[in-house]
C-alpha cells in the first residue's frame, strides 16, 4: 500500500497517539460546531440578564396552609409588567390547595377570577400581585386581594 492508506494502522495507540487522536476529535467537533452554528457561539452574552428587569415570584406546585409547600418549591422570573399568581382550589368543606407561579401579560386575564373546576363541588380562584415575592406564604395575606 502506498500513499495515505498506508499511514493508517489498526495497531494500539501509545500515550502520544491517544493524545493526538483526542486532539483531532476535539478539533473536528469545534470545526463542525463552527460550520453548523456559525457566529451564534459568539452572540451568547457573557453575563446573565439584569435581574431588576424581572418580577421574582414564589413557585410551588402543591401547597396547603397547614403543611406548606409539598411539591416544587422554587422561584420563577417573569418580565416586568407580568404578575405573580396563587391559584386556590377549594370546596365547601374547607378543602384548600394552592398552586403559586408566574404569569405573563397574556395570561393575566385569569387574575381575580373564580370559576367552577372540572371536578363537581370544587371551584378555582386566582389571586394576582405585582411585587417581588408577593405570592409567597409570608406576604400572601398582605399583598393579595
From Swiss-Prot:
Can you tell me which residues are glycosylated? 91
Question: What's any one GO cellular component for it?
Answer: extracellular region
Q: Which residues form the signal peptide?
A: 1-38
Disulfide bond entries:
57-84, 60-69, 76-102, 111-128, 129-134
Q: Does the keyword Glycoprotein apply?
A: yes
> Which keywords does this chain's UniProt record carry?
Disulfide bond, Glycoprotein, Secreted, Signal
Compartment(s) where it occurs, according to its Swiss-Prot or TrEMBL record: Secreted
Q: What is its main location?
A: secreted
Occurrences of domain UPAR/Ly6 (ranges): 55-145
Tissue specificity as recorded in UniProt: Expression restricted to the caput of epididymis. Detected only from day 24 postnatum.
Q: What GO molecular functions are on record for this protein? A: identical protein binding
Write out the PTM section of this UniProt entry.
N-glycosylated.
* Tagged with keyword Disulfide bond: yes
Instruction: State the PANTHER family in the record.
Output: LYMPHOCYTE ANTIGEN 6 COMPLEX LOCUS PROTEIN G5C
Record function comment? May have a role in hematopoietic cell differentiation.
Q: How does it assemble?
A: Forms oligomers.
The identity of this protein, by name, is Lymphocyte antigen 6 complex locus protein G5c
- The gene name on file is Ly6g5c
